[in-house]
Amino acid sequence: MHPLELINKYCPEEKLRHILMLHSRAVADKALSIARNHAELGADETFIEEAALLHDIGIVCVDAPAISCYGTEPYIKHGVLGAEILRREGLERHALVCERHTGTGLTLQQIIAQGLPLPQREMQPVSIEEQIICFADKFFSKTKLDTEKTVEQARRSLEKFGAEGLAKFDAWCERFL
């Protein structure tokens, strides 16, 4: 199934679908640009585009009225909820991108220490495609859809995830920019 068909299936509300599509398209375009500028990484561009378009599909389940999300779950769960949706659709590889893109990825230690309402397991990007999509996502917000963040703005938005997340982001800057 094409990513847009899945988005239409799970996100029938027009305003939310518009937000999701603009954000996801921006992330996909940046991720594809990174992959194309770094052919030595051998990233699967078709998968990057599909997975980037679907990485935030779980927002349809969360309570975030500022971005037209009127579900019942906390926003922090949008990655794992999106992964559940994609697993039901038979898209395991895409599901991993969903659950591993929060911050620069979440460690089991972070999940436990912060008491996050998430499965107690490592949820950090592993494959090069997961890393590229996670990195590209840090440059775009769902509240300022027409603006790409600078590296410094993206870093500031990651401060809440701690020094480990910032170090990973900085390493990705060196590798991908």
Each model region followed by its residue ranges:
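Charged phosphate-binding loop/patch that engages nucleotide di/tri-phosphates or the phosphate backbone
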Residues: 158-177
